[in-house]
Amino acid sequence: SITELCKVLTTGPLNADTEVVVGCPAPYLSLARSQLPDTVGVAAQNCYKVAKGAFTGEISPAMLKDLNIGWVILGHSERRAIFGESGELIADKIVHALAEGLKVIACIGETLQEREAAKTEAVCFRQTKAIADKVKDWSNVVIAYEPVWAIGTGKTATPEQAQEVHAALRKWFTENVSADVSSAIRIQYGGSVTAANCRELAAKPD
């Protein structure tokens, strides 16, 4: 449960050099924020691209800030696939969230069919470019490489596969954004990460 997870993260101990952020469904954001120490961030799993208006069911960055939530996950593959969110919409969401003072975990990743067709880099670059076309300040953006075929399936990209994509993304940032952003931006891997495999994944340079 969320309460049990909060207890684990509160008692730790957590590495002081590691930033920890917990992504929660919207109804539990306040609960998680109230039970976690300030050193652990809380992220919403979605928000909309405008501050206010007639958008029934949507959550704005302003609402998240009212709950003292500092992070939001945007562009998750399930939002892209199930809810039909385009790269342009996701980029608009990211720009607005950043402008409102939130930090963003921006998700990219390929499907199994795209990987088998050797389109992994092309897909990841296209999704990243849609964001880069609109984002000018990357200091509060984390890129999350989440191959669709590894999310909730029990299949995990090998550390070598993840490193290959992360290195390619860093090179893309050097060539298309700037060397400074490329060296500074955090690129994390997500997709069936467990206690058994996290250390090996984290040991990779990118």
Swiss-Prot record:
What pathway is it annotated to?
Carbohydrate biosynthesis; gluconeogenesis; Carbohydrate degradation; glycolysis; D-glyceraldehyde 3-phosphate from glycerone phosphate: step 1/1
Q: Does the keyword Repeat apply?
A: no
The superkingdom of the source organism is Eukaryota
Q: Enumerate the UniProt keywords alphabetically.
A: Gluconeogenesis, Glycolysis, Isomerase
Q: Which CDD domains match?
A: TIM
Which InterPro entries did the record assign? Aldolase_TIM, TIM_sf, Triosephosphate_isomerase, Triosephosphate_isomerase_AS
Listed EC numbers: 5.3.1.1
Q: Which GO terms describe its molecular function?
A: triose-phosphate isomerase activity
Pfam families in alphabetical order = TIM
The UniProt catalytic activity note for this protein reads: D-glyceraldehyde 3-phosphate = dihydroxyacetone phosphate
Q: Where is the active site?
A: H76, E146
Identify one Gene Ontology CC term for this UniProt entry: cytosol
Single Gene Ontology BP annotation: glyceraldehyde-3-phosphate biosynthetic process
* EC main group: isomerase
Show the PANTHER family listed in the entry. TRIOSEPHOSPHATE ISOMERASE
Q: How does it assemble?
A: Homodimer.
Family, as annotated: Belongs to the triosephosphate isomerase family.
Q: What is this protein called?
A: Triosephosphate isomerase
What is the source species? Culex pipiens (House mosquito)
Q: From which lineage does this chain's organism come? A: Eukaryota, Metazoa, Ecdysozoa, Arthropoda, Hexapoda
State the gene name recorded for this protein. Answer: Tpi
